[in-house]
Amino acid sequence: MKLIIASDIHGSAYWCGKLVELIEKEDPDRVVLLGDLLYHGPRNDLPRDYAPKQVIPMLSALQEKILAVRGNCEAEVDQMVLPFPCLADYALLDCDGKTMYLTHGHHANPDHLPPLTKGSIFLSGHTHVKLDKEVEGIRCLNPGSVSIPKDGSHSCIVFENGEFRFHIWED
C-alpha cells in the first residue's frame, strides 16, 4: 500500500496545491491527513495564500482516498463543508501487516503514547516539526507541516514498499 501522510495544511491554498500536485504524481492508495486542515489557529501566523474556501474543493476532489483525523483547529463546521470524515480523534489503519495509529498529536504524542503493541507505527502532526524515532518498540513519525513548518521546511511523508521517506518542498 502506498500512502501520502500530511498534516497542518492550515487553510493555505498555495501549499495545499503543492500537496495535490504530489498526490497526483505519486498516485497513492490513500491520503492520510493528520488534522488542522482549514484554519490557522490563534497561535500561528497566516500561512501563504490563506484561503480555506479554496482548500475545500482541493481536498474534496480527493475524498475517495482521504483518511483524516481531527486536529486542535478543527470544528464541527469543517465537517459541514468537507465530504469525508474529519472529526475522529484517532484512526487505526492496517498497512502491510502493521498497525498504524493516526492522530493529530495534541492528546497522544511520542511522549504520551496510547497502548500499542511493539512494532506498531504512531503517526502524529501538531508540532510542525518532522520526526522519525523509535519509542519503546513503536516507530513514531511526524510529517512536519505542509504550510507552517517550525523546522524550516514544508514537508509530508510518502510511505511505499514498507519504507517512509520525507518529501520536502522548496519555499
What are these regions (language model features)?
Residues 82-131:
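Internal catalytic-core helix/loop-beta-alpha segment
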Residues 21-22, 117, 158:
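Short, solvent-exposed amphipathic alpha-helical segments in soluble enzyme
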Residues 2-95:
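Core catalytic region of metal-dependent phosphoesterases/phosphodiesterases
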Residues 32, 67-69, 121-123, 139-141, ...:
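Hydrophobic/aromatic beta-strand patches that form the interior of the parallel beta-sheet core
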Residues 10-14, 39-41, 72-79, 107-113, ...:
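Active-site environment of divalent metal-dependent phosphoester hydrolases
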